[in-house]
Amino acid sequence: MKRLPLLVVFSTLLNCSYTQNCTKTPCLPNAKCEIRNGIEACYCNMGFSGNGVTICEDDNECGNLTQSCGENANCTNTEGSYYCMCVPGFRSSSNQDRFITNDGTVCIENVNANCHLDNVCIAANINKTLTKIRSIKEPVALLQEVYRNSVTDLSPTDIITYIEILAESSSLLGYKNNTISAKDTLSNSTLTEFVKTVNNFVQRDTFVVWDKLSVNHRRTHLTKLMHTVEQATLRISQSFQKTTEFDTNSTDIALKVFFFDSYNMKHIHPHMNMDGDYINIFPKRKAAYDSNGNVAVAFVYYKSIGPLLSSSDNFLLKPQNYDNSEEEERVISSVISVSMSSNPPTLYELEKITFTLSHRKVTDRYRSLCAFWNYSPDTMNGSWSSEGCELTYSNETHTSCRCNHLTHFAILMSSGPSIGIKDYNILTRITQLGIIISLICLAICIFTFWFFSEIQSTRTTIHKNLCCSLFLAELVFLVGINTNTNKLFCSIIAGLLHYFFLAAFAWMCIEGIHLYLIVVGVIYNKGFLHKNFYIFGYLSPAVVVGFSAALGYRYYGTTKVCWLSTENNFIWSFIGPACLIILVNLLAFGVIIYKVFRHTAGLKPEVSCFENIRSCARGALALLFLLGTTWIFGVLHVVHASVVTAYLFTVSNAFQGMFIFLFLCVLSRKIQEEYYRLFKNVPCCFGCLR
């Protein structure tokens, strides 16, 4: 028994459980029986608190300030323990996803993280930055703080964060409780700091950072920045107390503001001239002026951001490397904005805005387009529009425009259609109407050439196949040309259009060759010729489409329409064969008209020359539509686009099926007789066919 105290002391030193198992008072599952300080009892495990017998509660380490995870980390409590994880945009210094504070791990910024795609990360960064600058009350000091933090080493997260900070702080960038002279001085200082700060986000050095954003994110945040700049500069300008004309600039942005009262309205002409770019506003003329009103006008000049707002992702390309591969609209000028505020609002109503902007790239081939950035202040989604703007003058280096509204203006270089919105809508309606009428007429032609046995011949066989090919081409065009939401389906539609239109051209070529053989009097084997006609009419287009698809299948279907892309001149896989057939048919057309005119004049010498010419002209007009030579207007439109060529091409080819029906069926004596036999027993039709 004398050894028992020594054994207890030895067991305590080793922190071992004594042989007794606390049988009288059993321990809870999260506790164990131990001897501490010579006392045997139930003790809660680490991470739990209680007496070990009746209660052992989980400790909330995340609520314990001594156990907090530190800055830029979130704490998660678990049963008996906890762990820390860095917030999005940061990583642990130990490169482990989970850690605890006592192992020395901290969260550091992850510069390679795609935080700009994570709203949680953006919100966390904004809140963190706002916490740092919330105590800054003076606008100039606030802008200086943003400038210092954004002057170098920007990430996409930083750009988005500071744009949001500027947007949220723009309402603070004004002065209300200062003296008149102090207000004007402070407004000047604020505008200067504001321009210097915004320059950090729009200078060319930041383009590589903007490139890391998706197209939608880039446009949205850039729109928000421009909107914030417009609103903030106008708000600061309204703080002036006396007539003011103030300008300031940085490397890639310039600002000019005007503030004046109604007494000076006749003498102040708001304008801006920067690097040869000029903008001027013209108010509506009034007989009398309100003596109590004032006007603030703000011009903002963005030197370099145009490529960021182009429709292409390849905005990092230098202007001379632009490849107008599809129907794109690239900004080839600076972007200049004008905003205005008058009190009362009717004091200074706008009549028009004129501006002249220089081209960053010489545009000798593609047309210039006056445009403005049309966006929603609610969603900050925007796109270029030309509504309300018209081009007044343009050459290779400059373009002048006139608009009837305020916003951000620029000059676009467009490889798309050289027609206005109004003409485009009219041409669209003409195309739809013409194709519907042509489909009906072509269906009647197919029925006529297929089922009237009395008129069957080589010529009607060619007519029938031409009508079938053209019918299918126009049907696919009408149904599928604009179904570009699914890339695969759009590519299939483009491939079908490519084949059927080439097949139609092939049969137009066969029409020309067959007419030439008849007129010249060549004797041929009908069976052999029929076989080769079918091979040429249907197999040769398949070969062209097959080779084209094998070499450039990704060029079938564009982002706008389901047709061939102009990228890498892929469109010439259609234009090339079409032009060759048009050339062959034009030569055949010339020979046919010449032979027919001489033959008619020789048979009927008593008929006047005028009558012969008129007779040949009718036949020539029919041949123009039958041989597809009206497609020459399409070639002219590609070479030298204009509204005239657009209308000529649209009308002549959308209604091609109708003209074929008129010339081949309605005006044909033999087919008229067949129609008469078919409908003579129908009471409603007998009178009109008699």
UniProtKB/Swiss-Prot annotation:
Species per Swiss-Prot/TrEMBL record: Homo sapiens
Role according to the record: Endothelial orphan receptor that acts as a key regulator of angiogenesis.
Transmembrane domains' residue ranges: 433-453, 461-481, 500-520, 533-553, 574-594, 619-639, 647-667
Keywords linked to the UniProt accession: Calcium, Cell membrane, Disulfide bond, EGF-like domain, G-protein coupled receptor, Glycoprotein, Membrane, Receptor, Repeat, Signal, Transducer, Transmembrane, Transmembrane helix
Name of the gene: ADGRL4
Principal location class: membrane
Posttranslational modification: Glycosylated. Proteolytically cleaved into 2 subunits, an extracellular alpha subunit and a seven-transmembrane subunit.
Protein name: Adhesion G protein-coupled receptor L4
The organism's place on the tree of life at top rank: Eukaryota
Keyword Glycosyltransferase carried by entry: no
One GO cellular component term: membrane
